[in-house]
Design a protein with these regions (language model features):
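Conserved nucleotide-binding/hydrolysis micro-motifs of P-loop NTPases
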Residues: 49, 74-75, 111-115, 137-142, ...
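Conserved C-terminal guanine-recognition region of P-loop GTPase G domains, centered on the G4
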Residues: 60-64, 87-160
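Conserved G1/Walker A P-loop phosphate-binding module
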Residues: 1-83
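Amphipathic alpha-helical transducer elements in NTP-driven molecular machines
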Residues: 49, 53, 82-85, 89, ...
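Extended helical scaffolds that flank P-loop GTPase cores
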Residues: 182-258
Length: 258
C-alpha cells in the first residue's frame, strides 16, 4: 500500500492561533510568499522517508494575532505523478476525510497564466474550506486591469482574491489582512461545483459516500479515479464495476473529467 505523508500542524495552538495551508503550482512564487510572511519564524524539515522539504512557519498579523502557515510542495493537480504531488494529494485527501483540515487555504496562482494555475484551485474548492486566491507576479502583466478581481472572486466563490508581487514585495499586508479576516469569519465558501450527470452521480455515490466528509470533493475525487483508471484505497473492484455501469449508460469514462 502506498505510504502517506500527512502533515501534523503544531500542537501548541491556542484559541487565537490557527493554521493555514499555502498551495500552488510549481514556480508560482509560493515559497517566496511563505518566506516573506514568516521571516525567520519558520521550521524546515523533511517528510518521513523522503527528501522533500516540509516548511512550517508562524505569521504575525495585526493586533498581536498569529497563525501557523504550512507551505505544501508545488503541484499542478491532485492527480499525483511525483513524490511532491503525492504528498499534496495525500494531505488534501486527509482534509476531505475531516482529518484536521486547515482553517483557510491560500491558493497561489501565477497571474500571467491563470487558465493553467486555476485548475488546482478549482479542485481545492470542492473541499468547502474557506479559500483566498493570491494573484502573484502581477508586476509581470502589461495591463493589470485585464484581470477583473471582483468578478473572479464572485465566479470562484472565494473569500478574497488578492493581487500581489512577491518579487516587488507589495501586497503582503493586504494578504495578511485577508487571511486574518477569513480566520475571524471562518465562513464556508459558496461556489458552483463542476456539473455531473445525475446517472453518473448516482453510480459514484455508491463508491464515495462512506469515505469523505465533503460530498463535493468526494464526487470529484472519485470521478478522477474512474476516468483515469487509477486505484482508490483498495476500492479497485468497486471502481471497475462503476466504470462498467457508466459505460453501459453510454458515457465515455475516459472523458468524464473534461
Amino acid at each position: 500500500m502506498k505510504k502517506s505523508h500527512f502533515f501534523s500542524p503544531p500542537q501548541k495552538l491556542t484559541q487565537d492561533s490557527h493554521w493555514v495551508a499555502l498551495v500552488g503550482n510549481p514556480n508560482c512564487g509560493k515559497t517566496a510568499i511563505f518566506n516573506l510572511l514568516t521571516g525567520l519564524n519558520q521550521k524546515v524539515s523533511n517528510y518521513p522517508g523522503i527528501t522533500v522539504e516540509k516548511k512550517e512557519g508562524t505569521v504575525y498579523a495585526q493586533g498581536d494575532k498569529t497563525f501557523n502557515l504550512l507551505d505544501l510542495p508545488g503541484t499542478y493537480s491532485l492527480s499525483a505523478e511525483s513524490f511532491d504531488e503525492q504528498i499534496v494529494s495525500d494531505q488534501v485527501l486527509s482534509w476531505a476525510k475531516g482529518e484536521n483540515p486547515p482553517a483557510v487555504i491560500v491558493s497561489v496562482v501565477d497571474a500571467s497564466n491563470l487558465s493553467r494555475n486555476l485548475y488546482l484551485t478549482t479542485q481545492l474548492l470542492d473541499l468547502d474550506i474557506p479559500m483566498i486566491v493570491v494573484l502573484n507576479m502581477m508586476d509581470q502583466l502589461k495591463d493589470s486591469s485585464q484581470i477583473e478581481i471582483q468578478k473572479l472572486k464572485k465566479e470562484l466563490g472565494v473569500s478574497a482574491v488578492v493581487p500581489i508581487s512577491a518579487k516587488m514585495n507589495w501586497g503582503l499586508d493586504a494578504l495578511k489582512s485577508a487571511i486574518q479576516k477569513s480566520l475571524v469569519n471562518l465562513a464556508q465558501t459558496n461556489h458552483q461545483s463542476q456539473w455531473i450527470n445525475q446517472d453518473i452521480s448516482d453510480q459514484i455515490k455508491l463508491l464515495i459516500e462512506p469515505h469523505f466528509s465533503s460530498s463535493k470533493f468526494a464526487a470529484a475525487h472519485a470521478l478522477r479515479h474512474i476516468s483515469r483508471n487509477e486505484s482508490l484505497n483498495g476500492e479497485d473492484s468497486h471502481i471497475e464495476a462503476i466504470r462498467n455501469s457508466i459505460l453501459e449508460l453510454g458515457y465515455n469514462t475516459d472523458t468524464l473529467e473534461a
